[in-house]
């Protein structure tokens, strides 16, 4: 709305005393002021109200000609809206203003003749042959998981582009039989490709592929009365599970990072649903959770909450990101919320069939709407999550 000092009472009367992202615009050619606040009315009164004495506080009363705002229902929504607003208003400098910390990822470089894994915070163009797994809380956590996991395989750790030469002396990993040593033709290209495929499947399944492989070998050894080998395989299996226990639930192949985040809404009797598609955050949609007696007329057949959620999500379009940088920024916002010690809202990820756990989603909607703490369930720990996926795939435990 338009603003002038003599209209401050009108502005302060309509501005909500709740969270919002706002833009203050001055005359033509001037730079807008963008910010977020947990109480928009109070912030505008400080920025646009009559200054008290010789205060050094920022006051834009005589410069602002127009005020815009978007009400938000949660800190996560405020952060997302602030990101979009700054990106629109300052396309060249918004990243410096936001200072987002990009999410650490495990990158499997598949377009190299001899693929390898590394840890990065950068995503290459979509045409590259790399696969990414994450987001991890820190680079140290990503490196530890990658190193502990690669100990179970014989894929190379070196970073050089290889030109295989039988005269090459190799490295400590080849000496310890922890690498197939393609650098000096210690294996054929086909053998190395098979090992890379095993690593790729391990990361994509959260370690379950290797668990199945070792369990099968252990059971075969026991059936053949080779109990010494079975015991060694069991110890190896426990080490794999220790590595898997490091894995937060949210860490997945980025293309499989799909789910639904539920946050409080600025709208009355509603929650905000944020669809997550391949780590990209869709615009929020409101879900009215008023009682049936309030929201449904006698002529309208009532819908279950599950059906209403599915109907709302079906109409949500995935965001069309124009660059890998935008993808990284969405992951940074998601990672920042997920790894907070104290956070508002709930996140539910899809299973290996692409389906949401709808019963838990419905319960989550109720908890967020009522402001209750999340109820502990399979989404709380990585170990339980991957055991759930193993159960769904028909994999028996010990």
List each model region and its residues.
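Conserved catalytic/ligand-binding micro-motifs in nucleotide and anionic cofactor chemistry
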Residues: 1-398
């Amino acid at each position: 709305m338009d603003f002038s000092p003599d209209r401050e009472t009108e502005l302060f009367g309509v501005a909500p005393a709740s969270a919002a992202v706002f833009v203050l615009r001055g005359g033509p050619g001037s730079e807008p002021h963008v910010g977020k606040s947990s109480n928009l009315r109070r912030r505008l009164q400080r920025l646009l109200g009559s200054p008290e004495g010789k205060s050094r506080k920022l006051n834009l009363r005589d410069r602002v000609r127009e005020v815009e705002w978007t009400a938000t229902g949660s800190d996560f929504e405020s952060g997302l809206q602030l990101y979009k607003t700054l990106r629109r208003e300052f396309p060249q400098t918004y990243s410096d203003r936001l200072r987002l910390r990009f999410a650490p990822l495990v990158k499997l470089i598949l377009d190299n003749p001899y693929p390898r894994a590394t840890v990065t915070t950068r995503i290459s163009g979509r045409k590259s042959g790399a696969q990414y797994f994450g987001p991890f809380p820190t680079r140290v956590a990503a490196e530890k998981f990658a190193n502990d996991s690669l100990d179970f395989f014989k894929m190379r750790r070196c970073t050089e582009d290889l030109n295989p030469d039988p005269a090459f002396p190799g490295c400590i990993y080849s000496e310890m039989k922890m690498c197939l040593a393609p650098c000096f033709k210690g294996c054929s290209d086909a053998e190395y490709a098979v090992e890379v495929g095993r690593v790729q499947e391990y990361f994509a399944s959260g370690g379950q592929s290797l668990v199945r492989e070792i369990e099968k070998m252990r059971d075969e050894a026991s059936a053949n009365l080779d109990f010494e080998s079975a015991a060694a395989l069991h110890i190896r299996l426990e080490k794999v599970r220790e590595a898997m226990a490091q894995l937060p639930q949210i860490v997945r192949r980025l293309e499989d990072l799909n789910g639904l985040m539920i946050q409080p809404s600025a709208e009355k009797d509603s929650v905000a649903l944020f669809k997550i598609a391949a780590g990209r955050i869709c615009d929020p949609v409101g879900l009215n959770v008023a009682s049936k007696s309030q929201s449904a007329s006698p002529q309208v057949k009532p819908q279950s909450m599950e059906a209403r959620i599915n109907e709302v999500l079906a109409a949500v379009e995935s965001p069309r990101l124009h660059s890998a940088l935008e993808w990284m920024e969405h992951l940074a916002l998601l990672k920042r919320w997920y790894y907070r010690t104290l956070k508002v809202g709930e996140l539910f990820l899809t299973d290996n069939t692409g389906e949401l756990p709808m019963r838990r989603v419905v319960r989550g909607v109720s908890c967020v709407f009522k402001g209750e703490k999340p109820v502990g369930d399979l989404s709380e720990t990585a170990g339980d999550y991957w055991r759930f996926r193993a159960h769904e795939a028909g994999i028996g435990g010990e």
